[in-house]
Amino acid sequence: MSGKVGINLIFTMLMLSIQGIVSSQYIHSGKITFERRTNLEKRYSDPRMKRMINENNKIRNEGFYLIFNDSSALFTGIPDEKSDEMSWMTAKNSYYQNLNSKKQLTVLNLFGQSLYILDSLPQRKWKITDSKRTISGYECRKAVYQKNDSTRLYAWYTSALVPSAGPEGFCGLPGTILGLATEDGGIIYFAKKIEVIMPKKDDILLDAGKNKVVNLKELREKIEKDYGNTPWGKRMFDDLFRWL
């Protein structure tokens, strides 16, 4: 009898040890530094906008953080050390996702005004491919999101980072997105640094405070009403809802 107990005990300890090793191979919390590269020539087609763009300023590089744990994720811009004359041409929006309640709070920077949107996590139909690449030391698999006939996005995610999160609030893949790009390469995000940390509660929180909060449907209606008749309104609408 004691022999069976001993064997069972050894087996149990062995299984727990294996589970611990497997679990340690996956990252449940951390901080990712992203770089966003925007090609303004590809983003803006309006002739008036193009006149402001030249070889010296057509590429904008900006930084973002993705801070996450098992239950939430926050994607937010890194403040610029100094602004430049082209900074208004690219917006830094923030996204807080509660992975348990499946809710997302988005703060959009629209012409210097902050708009707060609370809605469910986006449900996107991804096509996962066999294509792989390494980003910041992690093997990533390529996935494709076909939003409509004119908008296709590519994501590279790793299952080594457990939370389903990524740049600009993108989620829905079996792991964390370390690379995201538009089909024409006009906007590209890549992870430059990955830190395995346990973030503080305040570091991963976004609060609307007393600001007015709308849902996605109400935001669409507001933008169409306020800017839909302007010559640049459609382009702004398309750019904004590329991510929403």
Enumerate the predicted regions with their spans.
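Bacterial Sec-dependent N-terminal signal peptides
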Residues: 1-32, 242-244
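Extended soluble regions of mature proteins
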Residues: 25-244
